[in-house]
């Protein structure tokens, strides 16, 4: 991400930065591109104030979708973008199925099975969702230590399905890293496995209960779909909130 230079004289490490929501200032870090940045992560909405205008890069993650009709919820959208001459303002960190934003840059909200990453299917009627095919690692950096092996925005899995008249279907697995969800397969009423990282698992298709989808557990990931056993259903799992990152390069 290229930005026009602001010129020398900005000491990024000692720059005064305040925020009235929940956030973490990791200080100066070296990321996988070998460059040094001041890294910030915002986990609730608030107002950001930076002592001097800076060039920075942001990563915006929307909330994941809830499971729906036994289908896994979609993972949220993720967007990386450079912002020049930025001194702060409103930061919106969305709950499940919401849109996050910073500096006039935002991502769309998701609901249902399709979005940033697809949710798994439930049966032959309620199929899987599709993803957008884009990396779900902040700043396209899949090896940085804070999130290595943890792509954001995983899809939730589909719940299992059992019907005395229409057979058994195992719920499809949730998608990972911008991929589509898996389709349901005949033969078993088991729930699918949530996508990596933190997508909710699908519920079991059982008429004896224990068939609710599980909630997502990582930023932007979708909830698992309920299991359906002869019309006995549990609840769909909930999607997980979004997050917003900002990194300020030491070289301005």
Where would I find each of the regions flagged by the language model?
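Low-complexity, glycine/proline-biased repetitive segments and flexible coils/loops
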Residues: 3-12, 17-49, 55-252
